[in-house]
């Protein structure tokens, strides 16, 4: 992942009680020029390959919500982002269902170009 980020965990493991684990695809950080310290993010990458992009969306959001709540509890320094290709961003997250999730703050998202491995845009 480019754009000034360094991968720190591949995957980022969330250790739960009783030996259970969840794995977020990536943990990353970057140095902040304007302030001391680092910014840390966790990234869950989704492909949206099913015939129904709404089914993919339901699954991705459910997983995002679970991971987000557990990260807040166990790794509060990380902010979780869903990462999708720019094409998926246009076909799913610029439509009503995806826009509602972003506008209501349910998910944080960025799109990337899978060929060049660069972040295209961040959506709040």
Q: Could you describe each region identified by the protein language model?
A:
Residues 45-57:
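Short beta-strand-loop-alpha-helix junction that forms the active-site gateway
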Residues 1, 63-73:
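Metal-dependent nuclease catalytic cores in nucleic-acid-processing enzymes
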Residues 108-124:
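Charged phosphate-binding loop/patch that engages nucleotide di/tri-phosphates or the phosphate backbone
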Residues 57, 69-105, 112-114:
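Nucleic-acid nuclease catalytic cores
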Residues 6-41, 56:
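Active-site metal-binding core of divalent-cation-utilizing nuclease and nuclease-like domains
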Residues 4-6, 106-107:
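Short aromatic/hydrophobic-glycine micro-motifs
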Residues 52-53, 90-93, 118-121:
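Switch/connector loops and helix/strand junctions flanking conserved nucleotide-binding motifs
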